[in-house]
């Protein structure tokens, strides 16, 4: 992000706002770690907004404020969380923390699937749009992961059936996109990473993390049983 500012892509005022409000993001990561007992994965600030189109010919687009991305490095798979600069700059505390928590759930689900080699056709959508903001059925039940009641409220409030924050979207449109600040456009139907089987085989997951994910799965099972009775 500092490089983008140095190269003139981000105005001084916007850069200062991002730097100043970055503490809200750090506080969110710390909060998620305390509420789950699990370390947050590697994350970075993307100095752009990411927009996604259903297909190349579509005029409709969605804004992706953060993404959980599998990356192949040294013939191994790593999962990183990309946090967009406009979310840091313009998001309210509750919104930022809810989005970070939601991405954290994606991270845990991906680790679970990788550990079980449960990846359909050896492919993962690298923007995970259908998962990130609409398909919550593939995620762990937040109550099985977090013990922070306020954080859980933020998640359920922001992600009832798919993330929408009209005030934040309006701010990003007016203060970022219309001002021609850095924007990455991706098409949902072309943004797929193929993950070779040997890469999955080479990927070693921390056994302590796997134990914690197994405990989460047990909690999910107990919560489902409670719903049945």
Predicted regions and their residues:
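Zn2+-dependent metallopeptidase catalytic core
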Residues: 18-41
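Acidic/histidine-rich, surface-exposed loop or edge segments in extracytoplasmic proteins
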Residues: 3-13
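Active-site scaffold of zinc-dependent metalloenzymes
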Residues: 56-94, 111
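Short amphipathic alpha-helical segments
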Residues: 17-24, 92-96, 100
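Active-site recognition of the HExxH zinc-binding catalytic motif
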Residues: 98-111
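Long, charged, glycine-rich C-terminal linkers/tails
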Residues: 42-50
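Pan-zinc metallopeptidase signature
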Residues: 153-229
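Post-HExxH zinc-binding segment in Zn-dependent metallohydrolases
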Residues: 112-159
């Amino acid at each position: 992000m500092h490089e983008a500012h140095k190269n003139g892509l981000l105005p001084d005022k916007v850069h200062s706002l991002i730097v100043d409000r970055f503490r809200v993001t750090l506080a969110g990561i710390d909060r998620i770690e305390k509420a789950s007992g699990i370390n947050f994965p590697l994350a970075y600030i993307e100095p752009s907004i990411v927009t996604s189109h259903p297909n190349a010919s579509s005029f409709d687009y969605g804004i992706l404020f953060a993404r959980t991305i599998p990356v192949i490095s040294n013939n191994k798979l790593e999962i990183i969380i990309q946090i967009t600069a406009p979310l840091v700059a313009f998001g309210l505390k509750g919104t930022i923390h809810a989005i970070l928590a939601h991405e954290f759930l994606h991270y845990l689900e991906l680790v679970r699937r990788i550990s079980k080699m449960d990846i359909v056709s050896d492919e993962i959508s690298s923007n995970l749009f259908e998962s990130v903001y609409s398909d919550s059925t593939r995620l762990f039940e937040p109550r099985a992961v977090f013990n922070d009641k306020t954080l859980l409220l933020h998640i359920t409030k922001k992600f009832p059936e798919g993330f929408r924050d009209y005030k934040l979207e309006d701010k990003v449109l007016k203060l970022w996109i219309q001002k021609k600040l850095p924007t990455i456009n991706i098409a949902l139907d072309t943004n797929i990473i193929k993950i070779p089987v040997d890469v999955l085989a080479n990927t070693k997951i921390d056994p302590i993390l796997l134990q914690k994910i197994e405990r989460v799965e047990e909690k999910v099972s107990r919560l489902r049983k409670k719903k049945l009775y």
